[in-house]
Amino acid sequence: NDLNTEGVMGFDYRNDYPETSKERILSCEDLDQPNYEHNVRFWSDSNNQWNNILDNIESIRAIKATGGETLLTAGFIEFMDRAIERDVAKNITLEFHTNATKFNTANIKRLNQFGTLNFNLSIDSIYENYHYMRYPMVWSKLDASLRNMLNKVDKNRIHTFSFNPVVSALNAHYLIDLLDYQIGLVNEYQLNRGVFYVDLLWPERKYTNIKFLSTGIKKDLIKLYEQHIDIYRNIGVQLYTVIDFLKLHQDYTPTEQDRLDMLREITLFDKSRNQCYNDYLHPDIIEFLETPL
């Protein structure tokens, strides 16, 4: 069943009933099972189906939430507080997307009440390039928020620690630096399972899509990513999607109009934030933007 109320935040959850299944953690394998009850809901404080979720929270064994920023969304906070109030949070696997900047004391206290935590962290880049993409947030504050969570959340509760960047011309050269940073955290805090999963920009026609970069840049990126597929043993690295996409489009030669469209989109982006791409983007991207084809 689907419930859509302004698309504020979506919940994907599973119930366990004695007559249908044994308790088990949400997984891809579960989706193939005939007795698996799988539901998607959108939060609304006035929706009967949402209230039904809260009223029957004892039956929920796993929930996946996406946003908006979940840790600022009233529905997600309400769900966590209700589960804690009913003393059932310890039975729930909590999976959610977050930009990782809101790991404050109150939220960490909530997270420590849940049985299992799966973090899907929407972090698109690192250092100054991150600041460019996530203005006005700065990298030092993000790093402090992440470390605050990792220092205070019970490590036994953390099952998955996943970074989920979206690749574009803005950050393509910095994904490996971000991966190295995540590897450092996984090792430093002895986390159970790290995942680095890169998504493609959508829709594909967006002017900052990597398909519109020069053939030379695309080949360089393929080489960069392929060098890092198999060298990590303590983290799941998913770069094949990006590599395959680049290979599919590596022979596409961008037109002058493609270059101008990308430049225009980036400069409009800059004006809205009082920034300049020359200060943040990789030299190869800057050269591509400023060299007529």
Please give the residue ranges for each predicted region:
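Core AdoMet radical
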Residues: 1-45, 57-74, 86-105, 112-144, ...
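Distinct, well-ordered alpha-helical segments
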Residues: 75-81, 104-111, 174-176
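Conserved C-terminal portion of the radical SAM core fold
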Residues: 116-120, 140-290
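Conserved acidic catalytic loop of the alpha/beta-hydrolase fold
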Residues: 49-56
